[in-house]
Amino acid sequence: MLTAQDKQKIIKENQLAEGDTGSPEVQVALLTARINDLQGHFETHKKDNHSRRGLLRLVSQRRKLLDYLHDKDVERYRSLIKKLNIRR
């Protein structure tokens, strides 16, 4: 589970301007952190299909934001996936 300090750190690292919390970069970074956190949960709870559905929803939401960013600005998209080590 991400703490408030973890979220603030992620926001600071990815924001485009001061106070920016809604840009695609920030949203994708936060979703990536939540997804990575959930993957550890599934190593110990392999049959937790209820949470797995939530994970798939998060992955889908991140994919949509990445597609949006790719359409708007390819360079920002490429730098973000390289920074977050996301496969594409």
UniProtKB/Swiss-Prot annotation:
Annotated protein name in UniProt: Small ribosomal subunit protein uS15
NCBIfam families recorded: S15_bact
PROSITE patterns membership: RIBOSOMAL_S15
InterPro entries: Ribosomal_uS15, Ribosomal_uS15_bac-type, uS15_NS1_RNA-bd_sf
CDD domains named among the record's database cross-references: Ribosomal_S15p_S13e
Role of this protein: One of the primary rRNA binding proteins, it binds directly to 16S rRNA where it helps nucleate assembly of the platform of the 30S subunit by binding and bridging several RNA helices of the 16S rRNA.
Quaternary structure (record): Part of the 30S ribosomal subunit. Forms a bridge to the 50S subunit in the 70S ribosome, contacting the 23S rRNA.
GO MF entry, a single one: rRNA binding
Gene: rpsO
Cellular component GO terms held in the UniProt record: cytosolic small ribosomal subunit
Family indicated by similarity: Belongs to the universal ribosomal protein uS15 family.
Annotated keywords: Ribonucleoprotein, Ribosomal protein, RNA-binding, rRNA-binding
GO BP of this protein: translation
